[in-house]
UniProtKB/Swiss-Prot annotation:
SUPFAM superfamilies: QueA-like. Belongs to the QueA family. Keywords: Cytoplasm, Queuosine biosynthesis, S-adenosyl-L-methionine, Transferase. The lineage of its organism: Bacteria, Pseudomonadati, Pseudomonadota, Betaproteobacteria, Neisseriales. This is S-adenosylmethionine:tRNA ribosyltransferase-isomerase. One of its GO terms (biological process) is queuosine biosynthetic process. It is an enzyme of class 2 (transferase).
Amino acid sequence: MDISDFDFTLPEKLIAQHPPEVRGSSRLLVALPDMPLQDRVFGDLPDYVEAGDVLVFNNTKVMKARLFGQKDSGGRIEALIERVLDSHTALAHIRSSKSPKPGMGLVFEGGIRAVMVGREGELFCLRFEGGETVYELLEQNGHLPLPPYIERAADADDDSRYQTVYAKYQGAVAAPTAGLHFTEELLRRLKDKGAVTAEVTLHVGAGTFQPVRVDKIEEHKMHSEWFEVPSETAAAVEAAKARGNKVWAVGTTSMRALESAARATGRLKAGQGDTDIFITPGYRFNVVDRLVTNFHLPKSTLLMLVSAFSGMGHIRAAYRHAVEREYRFFSYGDAMVLGRNEGVVR
């Protein structure tokens, strides 16, 4: 398929630069199969969830992964931690006039010292000195890495608003943004209705913002991210399927974790590992029936994913409606509910 199949015109004014004033007050476009598009608010989500349905949330936590400093040689350097390997070692993207060489010392804000010990592809392996762990150093001295389309520096409000209320495990450099709409009160309402909540972990990498640079999407190479599906979640999903209930993925990262864990057999299995799953039209979904997601960038892999899930024509119509009604787009924007379109030609 051609990348141009996933292009659309988006007015710049619709790119949300800040979160809504109140968490959970975003708009919700309900775009389920076989029903007209509905303009709702996010607090109406329980109206579409049945007792016994399972909602799967990604409990990753965004690291303050951006560090500023200088090389021992004096040149400025910026590091974006992509993955923590152990308590004192991490892989990072480096921005500098000249790339550091193995053995070169680096000094970041707060007096953090590190040595560049090697490379893995485009990533630099940094070994941090001192008694504190990488996570502790980042929490004390790092900066939250907002997406590139948010044209401002992160502030104190982002420290809380760019995290979900259920975030647990540090490791992401971008938020699972569909989850940003959920409040503790909404989670209680869903449980009161009889919905089951379950969790996965997928540490969202910086690659989620990388553009597709090929004309034919089949030639695109997906980035790899670490994920885990606990046994409790696999059991909850299997039980829901047996009851005839629906499985909801809260966000594309939850969907990618679930579908990755079902890749081998077609049934969800507990486990962990790296995934580079690339979901495009023609993919056969094994687990997810409903998806809560934000609005995605033109020509992005996530737009391809939702097109695979609900059908390209359906997504085009929904996005055209969203632009006309001036929904807010991307990480701090509004949300939509999608259903698996069984009529999609696969």
